[in-house]
Amino acid sequence: MRVEQIAAKALKKLKDDRYKLALVVAKRAEELANGAEPLVNLDKNKYKYTDIALHEIAEDKIVLEGFVETSK
């Protein structure tokens, strides 16, 4: 699958919130850079950490916690 398709699938998992997607990808990419193992079958030496993070989100391997939505 192309990166654009993976990004679109990951975005849908986060209810089309680009800001949340950017935060989750950045945090997970940082974890991967610091030695965390990928939760999907991708080689860390071949793929960028951000691409691995997108794949993980798209395949429901990563869930977003810690955001609380309030009603106005």
UniProtKB/Swiss-Prot annotation:
Gene3D superfamilies: 3.90.940.10. It comes from Campylobacter lari (strain RM2100 / D67 / ATCC BAA-1060). Belongs to the RNA polymerase subunit omega family. Its EC number is 2.7.7.6. It catalyses: RNA(n) + a ribonucleoside 5'-triphosphate = RNA(n+1) + diphosphate. Promotes RNA polymerase assembly. Latches the N- and C-terminal regions of the beta' subunit thereby facilitating its interaction with the beta and alpha subunits. It comes from the Bacteria. This is DNA-directed RNA polymerase subunit omega. HAMAP family: RNApol_bact_RpoZ.
